[in-house]
């Protein structure tokens, strides 16, 4: 149930907030898409941990690149 609310929040961000900020994600898929896929595949706890780990790598000193959900 709460998974659905988190997924809706991510989709809201992708649709309405992200376009205003521009494309700055250094990873593919984007961090928000990665979070969406991870939570859908593994549930809120494990998927949320994967998404958090990914967000911690999203900074100018990380090379970025292709990083799919395991």
Curated annotation (Swiss-Prot):
The keyword Membrane applies. Its main location: membrane. One of its GO terms (cellular component) is plasma membrane. InterPro entries: Membr_insert_effic_factor_YidD. Coiled coil: none annotated. Disulfide bonds: none annotated. It is a peripheral membrane protein. Belongs to the UPF0161 family. This is Putative membrane protein insertion efficiency factor. It comes from Moorella thermoacetica (strain ATCC 39073 / JCM 9320).
